């Protein structure tokens, strides 16, 4: 076995061990491990459920702490095993063992890279589930079709990431596509991964709805906001709400159009409107809509505070609601993020949910 190959594997494993050590420091492993022990003791107390809110908060904290402690503990253990296997391969000169060592190094590189990537989630709401609102812009059928393409793109992205995606509300376009849709995304760091997708998405293509084959430009807006749990107080005055019920539209069988199960809530001071029609129960739709409203109001307040802070830091990039963030030019096979300049030529893959390069760059650059 050539020395160069051995040196490369050893160098890779030692580098990974150093990076894992740095991650333990960055992620405050020792303090989190100690806190996890405390939380477990509190949850073992039979009286903990006398205060259900506190018990639920402890349960959420435990899950987040375990996400760091368990991950880093397993990583350290696997790195030690990989180094031991490498030493065995070097001593015995066994090709199969060396190949296994190379495979271990590649897998560990991916794991360390993933943990380093997760360090970029600095927003307090990053670990939360989230909602995605998609709204077709001006442009009639073409814009509605583009909105439906974006909806499919995000559903496929969620599928790739192992997130659960549930369409809570969807309004069909007059001819094709959708006018708007709301998706609830459930999964670890769902908001963290998706929050930089907020903005205007621009599509340029030869329209299938234009018999002359003309080139059309369409816009759709995407707004991502976190689901807020009960540990965060958001005051909503019932007098500020207008609650309407209506018959759900779309797929759902014979029952869906027989009762006014869909719920629309308007928050009159802000003009925010949320809708939910995915459940046959009006009660459950109303509860989901209230959760959406609470999350929207929280996000609006956070963005207001961020805007005030950004005024003091003029060098920061504007990533507001009306900001165009990505251009999809299909006839030139080019999708470009206008904030990070990341560009991909495989437009089909992007529209099939391959957004990792764009999202990774936007998080790394803090856009």
UniProtKB/Swiss-Prot annotation:
The keyword Methyltransferase does not apply. One of its GO terms (cellular component) is cytoplasm. It is found in: Cytoplasm. GO terms for molecular function: translation release factor activity, codon specific. SMART domains: PCRF. It comes from the Bacteria. Keywords: Cytoplasm, Methylation, Protein biosynthesis. Methylated by PrmC. Methylation increases the termination efficiency of RF2. The modification N5-methylglutamine is found at residue 254. Belongs to the prokaryotic/mitochondrial release factor family. Peptide chain release factor 2 directs the termination of translation in response to the peptide chain termination codons UGA and UAA. This is Peptide chain release factor 2. It comes from Burkholderia cenocepacia (strain ATCC BAA-245 / DSM 16553 / LMG 16656 / NCTC 13227 / J2315 / CF5610) (Burkholderia cepacia (strain J2315)). The lineage of its organism: Bacteria, Pseudomonadati, Pseudomonadota, Betaproteobacteria, Burkholderiales.
């Amino acid at each position: 076995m050539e020395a160069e190959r051995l040196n490369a594997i050893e160098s890779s494993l030692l580098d990974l061990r150093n990076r894992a050590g740095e991650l333990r420091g960055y992620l405050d492993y020792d303090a989190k491990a100690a806190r996890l022990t405390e939380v477990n003791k509190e949850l073992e107390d039979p009286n903990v459920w006398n205060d259900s809110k506190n018990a639920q908060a402890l349960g959420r904290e435990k899950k987040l702490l375990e996400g760091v402690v368990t991950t880093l503990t397993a990583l350290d253990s696997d790195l030690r095993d990989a180094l031991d296997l490498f030493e065995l391969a070097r001593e015995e000169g066994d090709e199969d063992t060396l190949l296994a060592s190379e495979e271990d190094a590649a897998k560990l590189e991916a794991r360390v890279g993933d943990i380093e990537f997760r360090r970029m989630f600095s927003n307090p709401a990053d670990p939360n589930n989230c909602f995605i609102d998609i709204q077709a812009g001006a442009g009639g059928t073409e814009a509605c079709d583009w909105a439906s393409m974006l909806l499919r793109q995000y559903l496929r992205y969620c599928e790739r990431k192992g997130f659960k995606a549930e369409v809570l509300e969807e309004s069909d376009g007059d001819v094709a596509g959708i006018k708007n849709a709301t998706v609830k995304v459930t999964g670890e760091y769902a908001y963290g991964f998706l929050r930089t997708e907020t903005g205007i998405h621009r599509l340029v293509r030869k329209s299938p709805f234009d018999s002359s084959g003309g080139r059309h430009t369409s816009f759709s807006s995407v707004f991502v906001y976190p689901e807020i749990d009960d540990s965060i107080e958001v005051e909503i005055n019932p007098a500020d709400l207008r609650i309407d019920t209506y018959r759900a539209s779309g797929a759902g069988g014979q029952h869906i159009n027989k009762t006014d199960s869909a719920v629309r809530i308007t928050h009159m001071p802000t003009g925010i409107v949320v809708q939910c029609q995915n459940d046959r129960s009006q009660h459950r739709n109303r509860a989901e809509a209230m959760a959406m409203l609470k999350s929207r109001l929280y996000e609006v307040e956070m963005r207001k505070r961020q805007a005030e802070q950004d005024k003091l830091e003029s060098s920061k990039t504007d990533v507001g609601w009306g900001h165009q963030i990505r251009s999809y030019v299909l006839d030139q096979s080019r999708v470009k993020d206008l904030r990070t300049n990341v560009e991909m030529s495989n437009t089909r893959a992007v529209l099939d949910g391959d957004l990792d390069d764009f999202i990774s760059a936007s998080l790394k650059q803090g856009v």
